A protein has these predicted regions:
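Metallocofactor- and cofactor-centric catalytic cores in central/energy metabolism, strongly enriched
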Residues: 1-155
Length: 155
């Protein structure tokens, strides 16, 4: 198996689920280093937030941080960096129904499309569950990084 970098597939924001979605709810941080009740915690996946009718991708995201609207873009902020009055996204859903969309099916490989169609019945996989295929892909990715002069950081 030779590794091929997956392509990013942006959501189709013309779909009804996105066009009909409300704007994300923004609530001011009550004080420094504190998020309001019901704040949205970011994940490992790309996340979009609907603000003033437009979907914004949170860049430089990280898990378990807080999305803050700065008037132009979504910034992903660690709790220790929240400032009193920051406009923080609140909401607990990830399906666009609260103006928050977690794009967990965004990396597309040709062989995955074939597998997805063939094994559609195997959908009982959580985000935190690893499978043998995951380890095989990790091995191929590490080989690819070594061959192309990449830089691997193990955390």
């Amino acid at each position: 198996m030779s590794f091929k970098l997956a392509e990013y597939k942006e959501p189709d924001f013309t779909k009804k689920m996105f066009t009909d979605a409300p704007n994300a709810s923004l609530v001011r941080a009550p004080h420094a280093k504190a998020a309001p009740k019901g704040f949205h915690a970011t994940s490992i996946f790309p996340e979009y937030f609907k603000i003033d009718g437009k979907w914004h991708l949170a860049k430089d995201s990280r898990m378990d941080a807080v999305p803050v609207w700065d008037g132009e873009k979504i910034r992903v902020v660690e709790f220790r960096n929240i400032k009193a009055g920051d406009m923080i996204v609140t909401g607990r859903t990830e399906d666009a129904s609260e103006g928050i969309y977690v794009h967990d099916d965004c990396w597309v490989r040709e062989e995955e499309e074939e597998i997805k169609n063939t094994f559609a019945f195997r959908q009982a996989r959580s985000r935190e569950t690893s499978f043998t295929q995951d380890y095989k892909e990790l091995i191929e990715l590490l080989k690819y990084e070594k061959e192309t002069g990449g830089y691997v950081v193990w955390v």
